[in-house]
A protein has these predicted regions:
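Acidic, metal-coordinating catalytic cores used for nucleic-acid/nucleotide bond scission
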Residues: 58, 80-83, 107-114
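Generic beta-sheet signal
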Residues: 77, 103, 131-134
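C-terminal functional extensions of proteins
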Residues: 163-167, 171-173, 177-192
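Catalytic core of membrane glycerolipid acyltransferases/transacylases, capturing the structured
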Residues: 23-81, 141
Length: 194
């Protein structure tokens, strides 16, 4: 109910609104800002379908149900639980032509530092990563590892769909780390300008 009081401003820098639904994409959002992303996707991109990576923990169960209500499937896994299996399932979703959404610093952080899974997934699938940023005019902060944002009722939500980020193939650990940092920097640039 409270979500209906929010006002939105959308900045589609990645031209995702005009991207064919036959072209799969990876959406990446920081963990502390993901709460209303399912509603944003339902409202602004209702024709896109796919799956979201949700923590295999008990806390992830209610998020998985919310994601399913807006038309996305839930792939359960994380860096500490069923991580490899989850990445392979997400790659299958992309191979079938659907999108995936990931919080690359979740479920335990550290905040604003992406893990390796999204890089492996982008390399394996060839799908571009679209950074997504949600900024709230008024919010509460939860005392959690990532200081999770809860938008206050009647606040303004600025949604930025960043430009597509293509992750290059790598053959060394150093090159892989460079790709990880390049994507992390692209995501952080949206946070820093807000």
């Amino acid at each position: 109910m409270w979500e209906r009081t929010l006002r939105y401003e959308v900045d589609d820098r990645g031209d995702i609104f005009n991207r064919s639904t036959d072209e799969p994409a990876i959406g990446a959002v920081w963990h502390n800002r993901l709460l209303i992303l399912p509603m944003v996707l339902r409202r602004f991109l209702p024709e896109r379908r796919g799956a979201a990576l949700i923590s295999a923990s008990r806390d992830g169960a209610w998020i998985a149900e919310l994601v399913k209500k807006v038309g996305f499937d839930a792939v359960r896994g994380s860096s500490s639980r069923q991580g490899v299996t989850a990445v392979l399932q997400m790659a299958e979703v992309l191979a079938l032509g659907s999108d995936v959404v990931i919080a690359p610093d979740g479920p335990r952080g550290p905040a604003y530092q992406i893990g390796q899974g999204i890089i492996f997934l982008a390399q394996k699938s060839g799908a571009p990563v679209f950074p997504v940023h949600l900024e709230y005019s008024r919010s509460w902060r939860v005392k959690s590892w990532d200081r999770f944002f809860l938008p206050r009722p009647f606040s303004k939500v600025r949604v930025i769909f960043g430009p597509p980020h293509v992750v290059a193939e790598t053959s060394t650990d150093e090159a892989f780390e460079a790709e990880r940092l390049r994507l992390q920097d692209a995501m952080m640039s949206l946070v820093e300008e807000s």
